[in-house]
Amino acid sequence: MSGSRKSLEQKIEALAALRRTADGSAAEAPLRKALADSNGFYVSKAAALVEHFGLQSLAPDLVAAFERFLDCDPIKSDPQCWAKNALIAALHTIGVRQAAPYLRGLRHVQLEPVWGGQADSAGALRGKCALALVDSELTAYQILTALTSLLVDPDKQARLDGVRAVARVAQPESALLLRLKTLTGDEHPDVMRECLLSLMTLIPAASVELVARFLDPENELRCGDAAEALASARHPEAFDALLAFLRQRIPMTVRRSALLTLAASPLPQAGEYLLTVIANEPAEAAEAAITALGASRFREEHRANAATLVKQRCTGDLTAAFDAAFAPR
């Protein structure tokens, strides 16, 4: 083992010892020194400890370290943005509302060598900065202006966190941006799912028609995401749209997926509908309804009725599904 590697491991072990033995005040001085180090991995460990202890007094040191790693050679000092990710997480956690570091991180691109070329390792950093910016000193309009670029970021994680950040701003303009993002689409299912869920949280009544457009059995994954968004909403029209879809002739795999989303519904109608499925529909759909009901907030309210319906159908598979779904928690 080289001397430099041994020295780094010793320093990291010293930080681990701080976590085990020190309170925040005793850790402040050694952590201030650690944040000034040139090794990104080591600084990432120090920043995580600052976050752990909630040391607001070290906010200037966190900012200085973040700016230093932005300005130096990233491949040598901070590969994979180890330090920068941890520094932004610490700044956000201890409540730093100064927007400057988050705005700089939002624009940072870090190309690193990979097999066959280069890849950007800063997507997650841009996403973290987006989420932190929501709690910054800026106005909602300024925040949304800065976040808009992330909705079309080349990196999937940055786009996903960008959608989440826009939704957290929770302004009418947020809904417009998310509506536009939904209409233009995204190649990654997780991003589209987040858009649909966010719209049904921000403006449920105005979003039902748009979200329901994605109830397309030809795209099972997208259809399931739309069903989940509608099912989780507190708006009766959202439930009605999902119910209308479930009454259509759709493949059983799609039907099962849509039924399972009703476990998240806050509306009493959902529990009542699941009982009708248990009573009247084919075993595969009834099993999904039993599973959904057992995971729902109406579990205890409808346990007895569901047990009676399962007993009436005299099907071993449904009995097994009921026993699994309503097993003691």
What are the roles of these predicted feature ranges?
Residues 2-23, 41-57, 73-96, 116-138, ...:
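Structural detector for internal amphipathic alpha-helices that build alpha-solenoid repeat scaffolds
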Residues 66-67, 107, 217-218, 279-283, ...:
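TPR/TPR-like (Sel1-like) alpha-helical repeat modules
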Residues 25-42, 57-76:
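Internal amphipathic alpha-helical repeat/solenoid segments
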Residues 108-112:
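Amphipathic alpha-helical segments of tetratricopeptide repeats
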Residues 61-68, 86-93, 101-104, 128:
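Generic beta-strand or strand-like secondary-structure segments
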Residues 30-32, 61-66, 101-106, 146-148, ...:
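Buried hydrophobic core positions in alpha-solenoid tandem helical repeats
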